[in-house]
Amino acid sequence: MKLKSFLLASVVAMTLAGCQTTSEKQTAKSVANVPLGVPLAPNYRNEIEIARYSELLLSPEINNDQKAELFLRRGRLYDSVGLSTLARIDFNRAVQLKPDLASVYNFLGIHHTLTQDFGKAYEMFDAVLELDEDHQYAYLNRGIALYYGGRPELSSQDLEAFLARSPADAYRVMWVYLAQAKVDANAAYEQLKANSQALNPDEWSTQLVQLYLGQLTETQFLAQITEGVAGQQQYAERLCEAYFYLVLIDNIYFNIIILK
């Protein structure tokens, strides 16, 4: 399962919970205009992979390091089919068998973020970077945890470090903006405009930045949502992204109005 997809599904849930304090009228305005997708069919391949890893874990011929890797892989698959409790059990088993497996701490940190146990989440992401300082997604994940944990200044630092590793990634640009907007909305807008210069205008994700910059209206943004879509899976992911960022932009603008 793609890490970006897992992260997006995770933070969408957190954002929706947080947006309940925002004007219902504003939120409904955006959501009502989002196109609907066809429900995705279950991914039976993942279920088959889970069964295969379960059989391998019963083998007496594998050592603890190999078991840890298998628990990590099966845990990720459990996450992909929505079995988060089983995923956490496997991740914890992997840590017990191989305490220096950085990726496991990364996923545990995500789970702690989802349960809003931010202190534990920070510890997990710190552990990732102690074991592997080049693990770039730990900067993203810790930045997201800090963002939802109410520490936007520290969040900005992590997300800027994540952006520096790929300045042409619109999603990274967006997360830097979201964190900076919590500190200084006007400065964040100017930085978003500057960071957008490195983006490819032909990438759909760039339209997210254009939406936030006011270069696209919401109607124009939604009208182009199907362009270049290769299949139902990609369409579902794009709808999820559109919903997520539309809710956030309404929340940001609402907060700016309140502050004024």
Give residue spans per PLM region.
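N-terminal leader/linker segments that initiate helical-solenoid repeat arrays
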Residues: 19-73
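Hydrophobic/aromatic packing residues within the alpha-helices of TPR/SEL1-like helical repeat arrays
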Residues: 53-54, 91, 125, 159
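Structural marker of alpha-solenoid helical repeat scaffolds
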Residues: 59, 63, 97, 131, ...
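Helix-start (N-cap) detector for alpha-helical repeat units in TPR-like alpha-solenoids
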Residues: 64-68, 102-103, 136-137, 169-171, ...
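Canonical tetratricopeptide repeat
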Residues: 73, 106-107, 141, 175
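Register position in tetratricopeptide repeats
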Residues: 80, 114-115, 148-149, 182-184, ...
